[in-house]
Amino acid sequence: MLRRAFMAIVGCLALTCVALPAASSPSTQSPEEFVLKVSNEILDAIKKDPKLQQGEKKAVEALVDEKMMPAVDFLRMTRMAVGPKWREATPEQREQLQHLFRETLIQVYSGGLSMAKDQKVRILPRGQNDGTEAIVRTGMSSISDPGKPEVQMVYRLRNIKDQGWKVIDVNVEGVWLVSNYRNQYGNIAAQEGIEGLIRRMQDRVDHPETAKK
């Protein structure tokens, strides 16, 4: 489920075909504009690079660092995924946790980028925005097979001072992904401590076939 869900996130970020309004600065950009801007940039990169379409790790890492990481509050996402035990982690352990969470997502992204040539995304109504946090609802569908059911996704974003909107979680068909990881990581950290969680995360990065089961 998590693999499918993160593939959908990649699709949603990368596959929008909606035209953007005039460029806006981070401070004036709406959350909808932000999602569409990032999506178009990633879609363009994937269309131009066969290595990305094939899921080659170095190409995916470059895409993540250049396009995806600036679009998310990754420290907050990692902290949310780890749960209460994050407060007990040393600075060095926190760096390790962020690195391993990034590697985990890259492995999943690699399996979903080939979808980019056959998808489109639309903004759905009933979004929310109080100026500090926002909800952006989207629907992803196949271009070649429009009869396939639309996959609905919900972005949760936070407006960070001097940086603008950043993604902090994504809901794919009812599942909040960071919260889903929190259930896994939180249980491991509670039983085995932060070092135990780091070992488990490292093992899954080293042996991704285990994580797919």
Question: What positions do the PLM features span?
Answer:
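Signal peptide processing junction and immediate N-terminal pro/mature segment
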Residues: 19-26
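Positively charged n-region of N-terminal signal peptides that target proteins for export
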Residues: 1-4
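Bacterial N-terminal signal peptides
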Residues: 8-18
